[in-house]
Amino acid sequence: MTEPTQPQAAVAADENQIVAERRDKLRALRDQGIAYPNDFQPTHHAAGLQTEYADADKEALDAKALDVAVAGRMMLKRVMGKASFATVQDGSGQIQFFVTPADVGAETYDAFKKWDLGDIVAARGVLFRTNKGELSVKCTELRLLAKALRPLPDKFHGLADQETRYRQRYVDLIVTPETRATFRARTKAIASIRKFMSDADFMEVETPMLHPIPGGAAAKPFVTHHNALDMQMFLRIAPELYLKRLIVGGFERVFEINRNFRNEGVSPRHNPEFTMMEFYAAYTDYRWLMDFTERLIRQAAVDALGTATIRYQGRELDLAKPFRRLTITQAIQKYAPNYTDGQLSDDAFLRGELKRLGVDVTQPAFLNAGIGALQLALFEETAEAQLWEPTFIIDYPIEVSPLARESDTVAGITERFELFVTGREIANGFSELNDPEDQAARFRKQVEQKDAGDEEAMFFDADYIRALEYGMPPTGGCGIGIDRLVMLLTDSPTIRDVLLFPHLRRED
């Protein structure tokens, strides 16, 4: 381990000194028996007061003489002789405390002067407006509820180090209003989705997180062991097969918002643990799903942000406009127009072009790949990142869609779509394959690919086949990446910005 630089060492020494001084203050509070009281109940919150009395002038507030009780974290403090001010932040916003020895008593005032930024404080008093027009609480009672032993980051620089923001999210939330706004928007978006689904007569369900067989997606699972049953199990990579079992069982519209786990890489748009919403509706197809998904995302934006027109990384997006629909080859030729129809149907050309673009076509997934899979790989290299406006890419090849229904009109193509916005996938849906014999044959092909070295190929799920043999009605199903959707709505460039506690390497 390398030695810290002198500035780092100096900062650490300063912080250690501050912590030591604060521990001494806490020790004194313990000696007085008042270290961590738990008998204060706020009657109001900062944002509510700021909103309700935004237009009330000084005279109106004085006449009303509203008694309030407010608690929160002290973010700023100005001691000015016989009158002091503190900016206090609760879960809703900030409000100013006005403190004088005449109102709270000399002993409390002297104690207040020794309190530190970051301390959790509480006050009772009367709401008023200062001569400078600041809505404030004129404190008649002031208490320290919890001592902060560690100092907050400098108010002008905040948490400059991005990794520290992720690792110490609790500090980031304290000092960064934008972070708090991001996660409030996330909560609003998820609440909007739940209401949208409920209004459409969907039932929310919970399915297992531990699976005896990983299924429902092409991904590498996390493996664990169930001690009581003495069996290998897998953290789920997708809830799909369980949700479709519920369709078989007679629940005709179901959805689940929960975690999936995939033992794969970390990137600005990938995290091994992530939140998905999957939903399934009997007697629908992929066209119905696209219409429904478009309306759902539009409504989530309106409910979370108040508008369907958003800005992402400096560019405007109008989610109120109809989403485009393109086939894979149409998208390739739109963004790479030099490719001809003949070239896009030529196995040797596609393999050579992919190799030129840096794709390793010798990996197991490409060994027996057909034209459709090669076209999809070329789409990912040439067009995917260009799909800024919301776009449904449709007509996916059957060989990369083992759970999707084959088209009635075009052999080798499935009734499947993926929704792309700002160059990244947001949703994936299709008309479900409900033919048990066809599904079993596709599972067997997946097993062959797994035996050939493709770690992401699916297992054969005999119980799922048994469920289909009881009969599943025509069904449409879709998965929406909640984290990526929130990235879009909150102008967040990386998935870590929308996860409260993203995975990081250990601190060593």
Swiss-Prot record:
Record localization: Cytoplasm
Keywords per UniProt: Aminoacyl-tRNA synthetase, ATP-binding, Cytoplasm, Ligase, Magnesium, Metal-binding, Nucleotide-binding, Protein biosynthesis
Gene Ontology molecular functions: ATP binding; lysine-tRNA ligase activity; magnesium ion binding; tRNA binding
Residue stretches spanning the membrane: none
Cofactor notes: Binds 3 Mg(2+) ions per subunit.
Record-level GO cellular component terms: cytosol
Keyword Transmembrane belongs to the record: no
Domain of life: Bacteria
GO biological process: lysyl-tRNA aminoacylation
Residues the entry annotates as binding Mg(2+) 2: E425
EC number: 6.1.1.6
Positions annotated to bind Mg(2+) 1: E418, E425
Catalyzed reactions per annotation: tRNA(Lys) + L-lysine + ATP = L-lysyl-tRNA(Lys) + AMP + diphosphate
Record bears the keyword Ligase: yes
Gene3D superfamilies (UniProt xref): Bira Bifunctional Protein, Domain 2 (3.30.930.10), Nucleic acid-binding proteins (2.40.50.140)
Cofactors, names only: Mg(2+)
InterPro entries: Aa-tRNA-synt_II, aa-tRNA-synth_II, aa-tRNA-synth_II/BPL/LPL, Lys-tRNA-ligase_II, Lys-tRNA-ligase_II_N, Lys-tRNA-synth_II_C, NA-bd_OB-fold, NA-bd_OB_tRNA
NCBIfam families reported in the protein's UniProt record: lysS_bact, PRK00484.1
Family of the protein in this entry: Belongs to the class-II aminoacyl-tRNA synthetase family.
Subunit structure: Homodimer.
Protein name: Lysine--tRNA ligase
Organism: Burkholderia pseudomallei (strain 1710b)
